Regions:
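Conserved donor NDP-sugar-binding/catalytic core segment of glycosyltransferases
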Residues: 91-141
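Non-catalytic, C-terminal membrane-associated alpha-helical segments of glycosyltransferases
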Residues: 240-248, 259-330
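Active-site donor/metal-binding and catalytic loop motifs
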Residues: 189-201, 216-238, 249-252
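Short aromatic/hydrophobic "clamp" motif used to bind/position activated sugar donors
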Residues: 78
Length: 330
């Protein structure tokens, strides 16, 4: 079973150079390593590397880069990676490919990742401890479900990584693999437009749970990758991060309703109840303990609410000037 690796990257030259070298040392190695680079300048090392299919893109848009990379792929299995990973077990590819062979209904496979993120350090601690009884009551009041590991629920809420091998509802973005014949069906143009407007978050969840319409997703719990605590390309400010992450939960709610046969009306209703409660909680927090960070968080929530009412999440409304079909075929 042949496989290609696709890596969207943006302004992480040292990381992507190191990671591609690590991939080439694995056995088996991919048929092709496809790097879709939206950096400010071209990566001459990768451009001149005969082992790399190097595509320079003008769009800093991760789902677009994923879909563009698939157009250059030839193998049956496509493995998507983030650009800032380290491989800690060189048998990663044999594990992924052998998992597909276990069951013909498996359409997606991932592996364990030692994941660290720097985003949380940009926010202040909550006034109420997240583990307190009051916090749990507030979560339940706002409609945040208690989700089991490996599962996803309304609002795109996930239950954390599954620590045993097994079927899951979603993948984490640093490592996702799918059968090639479904990729164009699970990365819709609406998602590209959402990210083009810098209003998208959680594209890994949207893509992977959409794949469940076509078969099973399987996660290998063994750690094969390490994701260091690098600066996120998604974090520009508290305001923009909260706005895009909250607005995107409406998109994830629609995908969740479609894939899991839930009432779209009820899922949208749950979204607006959630955002109303979050605005209320953020307002109280700001009054009790004022800070510029809490102020920006509240502004982001209000902006997301406004967008959810006024801006439909489809390509015609988000990016009427872009024809994705023509762009991807050129």
């Amino acid at each position: 079973m042949k496989f290609d690796v696709i890596i969207p990257t943006c302004n992480r030259r040292e990381s992507i150079n190191s990671f591609t070298e690590q991939i080439l040392k694995c056995n088996p190695a991919p048929e092709n390593i496809i790097v879709v680079d939206s950096s400010d300048t071209k990566n001459q090392k990768l451009l001149n590397d005969e082992n790399i299919i190097y595509i320079f893109s003008k769009r800093k848009n991760q789902p677009y880069q994923r879909l563009l990379g698939s157009k250059y792929a030839e193998s049956e299995i496509l493995i998507y990676f983030d650009d800032d990973l380290n491989i800690v077990n060189n048998s990663i590819f044999s594990t992924i490919i052998n998992t597909y062979k276990l069951d013909s209904n498996i359409v997606g496979v991932s592996v364990g990742i030692n994941y660290k993120s720097s985003i949380g350090s940009n926010f202040e601690d909550s006034i109420v401890s997240p583990n307190s009884t009051l916090a749990r009551m507030l979560f339940r009041l706002s409609g945040v479900p208690n989700v089991k590991p490996g599962r996803i629920n309304r609002l795109g809420m996930v239950g954390g990584l599954l620590n045993v091998n097994g079927e899951v509802d979603y993948f984490n973005g640093p490592c996702m693999s799918f059968k090639k014949d479904i990729v164009h069906k699970i990365i819709p143009f609406d998602l590209l437009s959402l990210y083009e407007r810098k209003l998208g978050k959680g594209e890994d969840k949207a893509i992977s749970i959409s794949a469940r319409k076509f078969g099973k997703l399987f996660n290998n719990a063994e750690i094969f990758l390490e994701h260091p605590e690098n600066e996120s390309n998604y974090f520009n400010s508290i305001f923009s991060f909260v706005r895009r992450s909250t607005y995107s939960r409406l998109y994830l709610s629609k995908i969740y309703a479609e894939v899991f046969n839930k009432s779209l009306f009820l899922e949208i209703l749950a979204y607006y109840w959630f955002i109303f409660c979050r605005i209320l909680i953020a307002s109280f927090s700001l009054v009790i303990n004022y800070s510029s960070i809490r102020k920006e968080k509240l502004k982001g929530l209000l902006a997301a609410l406004k967008l959810s009412v006024l801006l439909k999440q489809n390509k015609k409304k988000l990016t009427p000037e872009i024809n994705w079909e023509i762009e991807l075929s050129s």
